[in-house]
Every structure is written in structure tokens, then in C-alpha cells.
Amino acid sequence: MGRLILEHTLQGHKGRIWGVAWHPKGNVFASCGEDKAIRIWSLTGSTWSTKTILSDGHKRTIREIRWSPCGQYLASASFDATTAIWSKSSGEFECNATLEGHENEVKSVSWSRSGGLLATCSRDKSVWIWEVAGDDEFECAAVLNSHTQDVKRVVWHPTKEVLASASYDNTIKMYAEDPVDNDWDCTATLTSHTSTIWGIDFDADGERLVSCSDDTTIKIWKAYHPGNSAGVATPDQQTVWKCVCTLSGQHSRAIYDVSWCKLTGLIATACGDDGIRIFKETSDSKPDEPTFEQLTAEEGAHDQDVNSVQWNPVVAGQLISCSDDGTIKIWKVTE
């Protein structure tokens, strides 16, 4: 059995902490929460501490933050229906742009691999795609209304300009730009969960996706491209996503976040039962029928709901979590 070892417990925010995000270099992270503030933390020696507090960008709770792939920009999604773009061009972090258009709370934000596109989603049931036009200018490239309910999460594919979204309508949608008319279209709808899907994440090459839900299950989805060796039909020459594995029985309440480590292949979950669990693909796993086992679990990882987990993109086995209990924790996973 593996172990989840607590390395640091950090405090500073007032109220619940909704989101944490590692900088691409892995030596800095950002956090956000109910106090309408973003904190930038960095490691000095063996101590993590807040270096910057950004408190003038939003009027309500900040739900999620994400660094751009280049690490120069930070995007924050807020319940005030805006997304703010921050950069450190002058040595100090400044809010360079505020993206408006959503009618209700913005729940999630994600940068494409190139950094040229930004996606946001909202309680207004829409997904917006923004083009980075340079000089802190962002232009709306698409408004996608494929979901019938609140959209909880958006995540870009790690290598392609393909976007995934997860919703209160129990579905995941995939989007891509049509090469003929340059319009963004919904190319696939993934159905299997029986309740709200809170989190999604791609594996390292983007051929699989993990999802977590209010139905207390985790599901693994696999992409089947036109001409695939498994003989899965691909109507209209579009990639088909099939649910190839369901993990159930490990979580007693809603699973709010899931992170698939690009370095180790481990999957971490954040749960409403205050726990963090780590899953590993088994050695006899098959491509079209993968199997996963629980490597380790920390049942009382936090004192209240765990809202977010994210693997460090550089330091293998390092995991960060945040909670309604107002703490951030950094963990080391050993196999």
C-alpha cells in the first residue's frame, strides 16, 4: 500500500478555500476562496509562505484560478460573473483584463496548451471560448450552449485544441473548431453519470479522461478515433468517447475534484466526506477495459469538504489540496 504523507498545512484565507493551482514550474502556487482574494505562495528553503495577496479584482467569491502555460498570466473565475486576467509584467501582479459576458457565477477557467485560447463556464449554462489577441486583449470566439444546466468545469486537452466541459446536467461535452467554417461545435456528449459531474481531467496524452460526480463514482473515458483498432464506430468521422471503467464504493459523498498526474499516472480525488484518495492503474490493466485500484486514502485529510486537489506538474508525487476548513495542505504520495 502507498502512503499519503502530510508535509505542510497552510493558512491565510478567511473562510472556505475553493481552488488551488500550481505554477507550471512547480515552485509557486495560487489559492482562492470565499474572501475574494488570491494568494500567491512560494517556497523559500523548506517553508511555504504568501508572497502576494490580490484582493481588488473581484466583488464576490473566487471559484477557480489557473496559470497560463507560459506562467506569465493567472486567470481567476468569480461568482461576480467575471473572469480576471492577472500578470506580473511590471514586477507586481496587476489585473490587466476583466472578461465580461456571463450572466451568472463563473465556475471554472482553463487555458489551452498554446496559451492562445481561454475557456470559461458558468451557472448560466454556457461555455465561452476567448481568443488571446495580444496586449491584454481577449476576444470572444464562441458562446456554446450545449448544456441544459449549470456548467461546473472546463478543461482543455493537453495536446490539441479540444475542450471538455462538465455539468449539473450529468453530462460531459467535447468541443472542437470546425476546420471548414471555423465555428466551434459540440463534437461529443459523454453520458454515464447519474448526477452532477464536478470535475474532469485528461491523462498525459489526452487519450483518456477521468470524471468525478455527485453520484460518488469516478469514471474513466477513452477516445476512439476514426479507424480505431477496436472497431468502435465513429459517426461523421468524429472521435467517440466511451466509458471504459467505473470506480464505485470508495467515496461516501460527492466527489468535488479529480486530478490525473501527468508524471506518474496516479489519480487523486477530493471528496465531500473530508477525504483524499489516490488511485493507480493495475499492472494487468487492458487498453479497452482498464482497471484501477485504490493505492491509499486519507479519510480525514481535512476537517470539512475537500474542494480541490492538484498534482504538482514538476515534482512527482506532490499533491496540494484545499478545503472548506480554510486550510491548504501539501502532501507527498509514496507508492
Swiss-Prot record:
One of its GO terms (biological process) is iron-sulfur cluster assembly. Gene3D superfamilies: YVTN repeat-like/Quinoprotein amine dehydrogenase (2.130.10.10). WD repeats lie at residues 12-51, 57-96, 101-140, 146-185, 192-231, 250-289, 301-335. It comes from the Eukaryota. Keywords: Repeat, WD repeat. Essential component of the cytosolic iron-sulfur (Fe/S) protein assembly machinery. Required for the maturation of extramitochondrial Fe/S proteins. Belongs to the WD repeat CIA1 family. This is Probable cytosolic iron-sulfur protein assembly protein Ciao1. The lineage of its organism: Eukaryota, Metazoa, Ecdysozoa, Arthropoda, Hexapoda. The gene is Ciao1.
